Amino acid sequence: MFSLQDLCRKNIFFLPNDFSKHTLQWLGLYWKEHGSVHRAEKDSIMIQNELVLSINDALLLAGEEGDTDVVQLLLLWEGNLHYAIIGALKTEKYSLVCEYHSQIQDWHVLLPLIQDPETFEKCHDLSLECDFICLLQHAVKCDMLSILVKYKEDLLNVRIRHRIQSLFVLACENRRFEIIEWIGQNLPIPEPEAIFSIAIVTKDIELFSLGYKLIFDYMQRQGTFQLTNMVRMLLLNRYIGMAIEKGLLPFIVETLKYGGSVNRALSYAVIDNKRKIIDYLVRHENIPRGTIERLLHLAVKKQSSRKTLNLLLSYINYKVKNVKKLVEHVVDHNSTLVLKILLEKKENLVDAVLTRLVKHSTYFRVREFIQEFSISPEKFIKIAVREQKNVLIEAISEDIWENPTERITYLKQIVHTIKYESGRRFLIDIIHSIYQSYSLKHEDILKLAIFYVKYNAITHFKDLCKYLWLNRGTESKKLFLECLEIADEKEFPDIKSIVSEYINYLFTAGAITKEEII
């Protein structure tokens, strides 16, 4: 009969109007001082066919009244026992608590359901293995500020003051803003900066903003957290860096409100290639051109992405004013991507960079740059001649033209294009050193001799004449006559004097007549 009664009670969703109080009591569907009770829906009940309550609210009320029978009925209707126990604790109906005590494995589970601080503390006291700090921790988790207020003096006691930091961190992790503010206004927090790390990790801008309010409005004003201007700026810059690393623009904007450096924010954003942040700050903070160029230098130095470089260049319309500084960074940090971007926009800084490379860098760096930008040998050699880099010219020209005759031929052609005398002399000296290092064919030496005559290279020509006379003797007659004609035409007296000397040798040897000389 009992199981049938339970089955009826569990499944009755409608009570006939003619059920008497006695019948309802017999069925167990009567609540003392409230009237008939039955299920209205799966998770609610109806009292006296009028008042509708959720099953858990009804359990809370039944627990407060200590009505074990109604509690059993509501549990049959799938209510949560925790609410009955909370109600019983509130009104100290401990007999009901004792009856169900064994069914509760962890009393902490009930705490989030409790609104009343006194009941909250009573419930926590039932966890016999827990201490005072555990109570405070759960008060923070469950947003029970009144308990912290109650035990403020205990928290200030030297024995447990060190626990304030962990409670503060717990409040931050659980977003208990009211508790965070109260702690900031009433308790000494050893490391309040923890709020910023938590806010950034959880991407919680409200918590992040509260951190600044806490430090700069509450704690600093009260003297519990003193900051010099330098330390303040260091803190702000640190949080800017953390926010940029995560790409959190609202956090950066919030930091700028408290005196954070927009230039530092832009620098971090450039290094981390955070283009949306860069674009927002440049447009909203009216960043001047000079600052943008400095950011461009930083981007080159840190080898930022193509998109970041493009963005920065777009702000200055791809026109760089401080070319010298940009070139220095390109060379010093071997960062050439910006040159390629500028080339695409018809802005050529390759020559300027090549000049600095030739002047200050190694053979390997120069060769790599020449290959990367497909620079013509003539352009490189002219720059190297201007910078007087003979070893560099010799090494790279040997890479380009392995055959010494071919090398001399091309270098001679470049001499023709050099417009200043000292440059021509410098390159002719290099050509002569190549001649001295290799054994050239006779016809190539003859061509070189004529070349020397045309450019009045007296010493080198004299050297060749000596070689030709010793090794070819009178066979060089035709060359000497041709050189004499050129020297007359160009009015090179020193060359003419050298040639005349060897023509006299030819005449003495009977290899030439007066008529041929005339």
UniProtKB/Swiss-Prot annotation:
Q: Would the keyword Repeat turn up in this protein's UniProt record? A: yes
Q: Which InterPro entries match?
A: MGF_505
Query: Out of the domains of life, which is the source?
Result: Viruses
Task: Extract the Pfam families matched here.
Answer: DUF249
Q: Provide the alphabetized UniProt keywords.
A: ANK repeat, Repeat
Q: Where are the ANK repeats?
A: 54-83, 129-158, 261-290, 292-322, 324-351
**Family assignment from sequence similarity:** Belongs to the asfivirus MGF 505 family.
Q: What does this protein do?
A: Plays a role in virus cell tropism, and may be required for efficient virus replication in macrophages.
**What protein am I looking at?**
Protein MGF 505-6R
